[in-house]
């Protein structure tokens, strides 16, 4: 990771480019933190949320955030919502427990892939995909299989730059109840960092890694960041607060 002085310069250089961004999944745990950090760092000239419902915010910092409400079952009809964005962040996701196996596949694979296709067609140059540690299209575990399938399909779209993030267990206080994740967070949260680094990461660290990677020069058409790389890239890099 670049030192703080270099990182600050990279951020300032990025701001001068007056780029626009869209966020998918801004109502989720990672998406909420991502939006807050993007606004706090003032990285983009235009910020757009794309989702199935309009979100409400109380803070003034959110006043200029644009929102596009779409029907994910009919995304082709909402292609204009994906046009004119330089950068895209996809934090969409649900669980098999909440949506059932078919619903999970529909959201985590079909919605994500169609959104990526529309973003590519709409001119998006840099697509950032939140995936998962262990993602593998050949996995016998549905969750990891779907994540791996999406990664492969999005890579085929040939964005100018594709950044895929594979965090482990996300350490946060979810509003949505996920008992398995809760137990894992309690377990990994009690371990020394050196032990947990391969398996868990705070959400805010994931988000800061995403943004630090964003403003840094790309390392190729596709960048794959595993949990340890995310921890390294996102640590000790506090941005401005709202």
Swiss-Prot record:
It holds the Pfam family NAD_binding_10. The modification N-acetylalanine is found at residue 2. Keywords: Acetylation, Disulfide bond, NADP, Translation regulation. The active site is at residues 143, 147. InterPro entries: NAD(P)-bd_dom (IPR016040), NAD(P)-bd_dom_sf (IPR036291). NADPH binds at residues 27-30, 52-53, 92-93, 143, 147, 170, 178. Residues 2-25 are annotated as: Required for interaction with elongation factor EEF1A1. GO terms for biological process: angiogenesis; import into nucleus; positive regulation of programmed cell death; positive regulation of transcription by RNA polymerase II; regulation of angiogenesis. It comes from the Eukaryota. GO terms for molecular function: protein serine/threonine kinase activity. One of its GO terms (cellular component) is cytoplasm. Monomer. Forms homodimers during oxidative stress. Interacts (via N-terminus) with elongation factor EEF1A1 (via middle-region); the interaction is direct and competes with EEF1A1 binding to guanyl-nucleotide exchange factor EEF1B2, thereby inhibiting GDP for GTP exchange and reactivation of EEF1A1. Interacts with nuclear transport receptors XPO4, IPO5/RANBP5, IPO7, IPO9 and KPNB1 as well as GCN1L1/GCN1 and LRPPRC probably through their HEAT repeats. Binds NCOA5/CIA. Represses translation by preventing reactivation of elongation factor eEF1A. May also inhibit nuclear import by competing with nuclear import substrates for binding to a subset of nuclear transport receptors. Has additionally been proposed to act as a redox sensor involved in cellular oxidative stress surveillance. May bind NADPH. This is Protein HTATIP2. It comes from Rattus norvegicus (Rat). The gene is Htatip2.
């Amino acid at each position: 990771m670049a030192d703080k002085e270099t990182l600050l310069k990279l951020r300032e250089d990025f701001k001068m480019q007056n780029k626009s961004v869209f966020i998918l999944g801004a109502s989720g745990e990672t998406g909420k933190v991502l939006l807050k950090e993007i606004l706090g760092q003032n990285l983009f000239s235009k910020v757009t949320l794309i989702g199935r419902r309009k979100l409400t915010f109380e803070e003034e910092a959110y006043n200029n955030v644009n929102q596009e409400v779409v029907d994910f079952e009919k995304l082709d009809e909402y292609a204009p919502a994906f046009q004119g964005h330089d950068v895209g962040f996809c934090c969409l996701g649900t669980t098999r427990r909440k949506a059932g196996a078919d619903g999970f596949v529909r959201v985590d694979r079909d919605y994500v892939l169609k959104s990526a296709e529309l973003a590519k067609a709409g001119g998006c140059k840099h697509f950032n995909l939140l995936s998962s540690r262990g993602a593998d299209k050949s996995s016998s575990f549905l969750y990891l299989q779907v994540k791996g399938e999406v990664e492969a399909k999005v890579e085929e779209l040939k964005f100018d730059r594709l950044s895929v993030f594979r965090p482990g267990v996300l350490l946060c206080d979810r509003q949505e109840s996920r008992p398995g994740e809760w137990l894992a967070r309690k377990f990994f949260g009690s371990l020394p960092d050196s032990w947990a680094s391969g398996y868990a990461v705070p959400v805010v660290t994931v988000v800061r890694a995403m943004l630090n990677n964003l403003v840094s020069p790309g390392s190729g058409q596709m960048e794959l960041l595993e949990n340890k790389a995310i921890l390294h890239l996102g640590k000790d890099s506090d941005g401005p607060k709202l």
